[in-house]
Structure formats: C-alpha cells, structure tokens
Amino acid sequence: MEALKRKIAEDGIVLSDQVLKVDSFLNHQIDPVLMQQIGREFARRFEKDEITKIVTIESSGIAPAVMAGLELGVPVIFARKRKSLTLTDDLLTASVYSFTKKTESQIAISGNHLSKDDRVLIIDDFLANGQAAEGLLSIVKQAGAAVCGIGIVIEKSFQPGRDELVKKGCRVESLARIQSLEDGKVTFVQEVRS
C-alpha cells in the first residue's frame, strides 16, 4: 500500500535494526485518514472471504481493525491483555510474548462473541515474530471458528513471523513489508505484481 509506505518513509523512526517507531500515526497518535485507507485496503483484499468477525489485540490493532470492520460491515473483537472485572465467563485465552515490550501477556476474548459459524479475519499493527497472531489464532481455533486470513499493517519480513504463519497454512496479507532497518534506513520488500 503506497500511502502507508510513504508515511513510514516520511514519519517512521528507525530505532535499531530491529525496531521501527511509528507512534506518530499508528500506535500512539493515530492518523484517521490513513487508518480509513488501511481499512479499505483490508476490506478489498478480503471482500470475497465472507468475513463475519474481525479479531485483533489491544491496543494498536484496534484502529485498523475497526476501520476494516466498518468497511466490511462486521463486528470487531479485541483480545484484552489485562484482567477485567467484566470479562470473566467463558474466556478463550492464549499466552503472547511481546517482542517490543519483552513481556508475556495472557490475552483473552469472551467466548460469547465467537462461534463455530464465524469466518474470522485477524488484524494486527505489526508482524515480527508472529506471537500476537499465533495467540489470536489459538483463541479463534478454541472457538471452533474459521480463520480466513491475517491482515498486517506493517510486516518486518526479516523476522520469522510470516514464515511461521504460512507454515501453519495461514494466508497473510501485509500492507507494508519491510526487508530491512539496517543503517537507520527503511527498505521495503520489492513485491512482484501479477
């Protein structure tokens, strides 16, 4: 997605050869126009998949997921990382390690919101090692629902997340694929269009 790549190139800050900071438009301050474009692009890529629910993880996945949900006309469910007084019954849970925060979290979704009849699109802001996506996959499978695909805003293709998900049979659609963050520079994967 060219608009996203431009935004990353202009406003993204390379903190190391492993970490890209995009808090000015994605995961702290949110650019709503860009989020709307992201939602439309996910909807376009998954429009034939008869999606019934979108699942994401709090908090940075919520904005792109809601915009995609708006475009597809389906509800969005986000997995909580923190315990909630109201989220107690029929929980679907998974353990997720955060590469950025270097912490492990127990994520949870109420089983009341997912069923075996659902066709789910998983959306997240970043794909690095694939831990968040794998946790969400586990939760969706616990519900008996079908995963139609995984939509990623920014993929760090130099890390193993995509390969791990593809090995599990997942369709992964990333809007911006980063080949490298070496020398303080963002280099995108050159994708061949058919």
Swiss-Prot record:
Stretches assigned to coiled coil: none
Taxonomic source organism: Bacillus velezensis (strain DSM 23117 / BGSC 10A6 / LMG 26770 / FZB42)
Pathway info: Purine metabolism; XMP biosynthesis via salvage pathway; XMP from xanthine: step 1/1
A Gene Ontology biological process term: purine ribonucleoside salvage
Taxonomy, superkingdom: Bacteria
Pfam families: Pribosyltran (PF00156)
GO cellular component, one term: cytoplasm
Protein name: Xanthine phosphoribosyltransferase
